[in-house]
Structures are given as C-alpha cells and as structure tokens.
Regions:
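PLD/PLD-like phosphodiesterase catalytic module centered on the HKD motif
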Residues: 1-184
Length: 184
C-alpha cells in the first residue's frame, strides 16, 4: 500500500511533493490560512520551469509584520467589511510584510518580478476569503502526462501545512494526498 502521508520528516516533505506535482500539473488551486512569501520562495523554481501553469490561491487570514517577522492575523473587523475592503487590507498588509529588510536581496526581487508577471498575465490569482478560514487544501489538475502516470485527472493534499516555509518543509506536519476521490 502506498504511503499517502506527508509529514516533512525523513524525505517526505510537502515541498518536494508539491514540486513534483507542479511538474505534471496544468492548474493549481490552493486554499490556505497563511500565505507567506517564504512558501512562495520554496516553490519558485518549480513554478518558473512551467511557463503554462495557472495558480489560484485563496487566503483565509491576513499577513502582518511583527518584530521583524511576518505572521498572519485573524482580523476581527472582517465581519463588518465588504469584500473590496478585505482585499484592500490584505494587500496593504502584504505590502508592509514585503518591506521587511530580510527580503532585500537580488534573488527576492527576481522572485517578486516573476510573481508580479504571473499576476499581470492572469496566470496567478490571489483572493481573500470573506470570513477567516484556516483550512489547507492543495488541488492539482494534472496535464495529460500526469494523468497517465496516476490514472486520475488530479490529486489533492489536505492537512496541517500552510503555504509557508515551515509548512512546506521546516516543521513536522501531517498531510494526506488523495487522488481517487472527488475528481468526477
């Protein structure tokens, strides 16, 4: 029986699995509570290698800057805010987080440029949930080669990992990959 559990321990990191699935995917859809640029950085090379891939990210919480570190917050004002206000606050908090000095490197600027190009080309969409949401779900719609390898139109991973460096490889997590359910 195949081991579908991904724990970030002993050569079973979510980063490695997502990178492999990106190689065989035509579209990615991620629902995450936290979206740090540290997670984007971990997937950058894999995404850059696919000039045709589309990515949709739905973020359930905001980002903010605290003591020189990026972290996410559950905004209590969200209950009384319009979708436009939520999106505005999310991108404002992202701008603050991106001004952190630890991100002031040439590599980071190249990654941001790639990120912005994906947005401009319509290959990347980032949206904010109306209500706070801490769920984690990674959907992979496979290309024809990927479908023939796993005999399924897609795969999904759900569990505890956010789209952060820690969630992708830095700390113990528990995720499960499923491919035989929910694709019809």
């Amino acid at each position: 029986m195949a081991n579908n559990f991904i724990t970030n321990a002993q050569q079973r990191s979510l980063k490695d699995r997502i990178q492999l699935l990106i190689k065989y995917s035509q579209e990615l859809k991620f629902l995450v509570g936290f979206f740090y640029f540290s997670g984007w950085r971990e997937l950058y090379e894999s995404l850059k290698a696919r000039n045709d891939i589309k990515l949709k990210i739905l973020v359930g919480l905001d980002t903010d800057l605290h003591l020189g570190k990026v972290f996410e917050i559950d905004d209590p004002k969200a209950i009384h805010s319009s979708q436009q206000e939520l999106v505005g606050r999310f991108f404002a908090s992202l701008r603050i987080a991106l001004k952190d000095e630890s991100l002031d490197t040439q590599e980071f600027y190249e990654q941001v440029d790639f990120f912005l190009n994906l947005l401009e080309e319509g290959r990347l969409q980032i949206r904010k949930t109306f209500d706070p949401n801490h769920a984690k779900l990674y959907l992979f719609l496979l290309d024809s080669e990927g479908q023939s390898l796993v005999n399924a139109p897609g795969r999904f991973i759900t569990g505890s990992s956010n789209l952060t460096r820690s969630g992708l490889l830095g700390q113990n997590e528990f995720n499960v990959e499923i491919g035989d359910y929910g694709w019809e």
